Amino acid sequence: AINGGNVVDKSENMPWYDGQTVLEHLEGLHSSDVFEAGKARFPVQTVIRPKTEEYHDFRGYAGKLYGNSIKVGDAVTVLPSLTESKVTKIHFFDKTYDEAVAGSSITIELENDINVTRGDMIVKSSELPKIEKEITTTVCWMDSKKLVAGTKYIVQHNTNAVLAKVESIKNTISTDYSGTKEASQLAINEIGEVTIKLSKPLYFDAYNENKSNGAFILIDTATNTTAGVGFIR
């Protein structure tokens, strides 16, 4: 609010209130780290192939590790191809390590020469995510143009961009989560349950199990603007 009080400093207009300011309250909140909860997920941002004489056979996969740690020797699966391999090296800047912790930006090498591209995801073979072409989500709508069934958007999920269609809108959710109301569209700043159909499978976890791999944004195909944010159920 433009003229809001008790946000940073105590308000003279609220002498009856002896609690914390909004800022003091926010600074005292404790939240779980988004990087350190769940199963190891490694969305590939880029493939590194120097093509120099010294590193003529180097093939590394760079990205940020979410959810949990990964170690040299771990059996891994590349999605969506479901190709299996093992981690042989983990690079961080100019050094190699036996293990990388969640939140690290690293480059990893795999045992065999396989096809991996940006948008793929490397996971432990024992911890596969869900792989589906339809997702049930909670969407917070941020566009002045209403969200209605049948419209197409790009789902940007980690480094993977997938063309998708809004299959249905079930309801809107009160901002205090006190209840729901049946709805067929979402207006700006509304939150609702939305089913989305994807043009190709998405590899994901529920948001409450892995925040980084359970969240996405919806991008308008015409304007390339971010129209909404979503959380997979």
Language model segments and positions:
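Canonical P-loop GTPase G-domain recognition
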Residues: 1-39, 43, 48
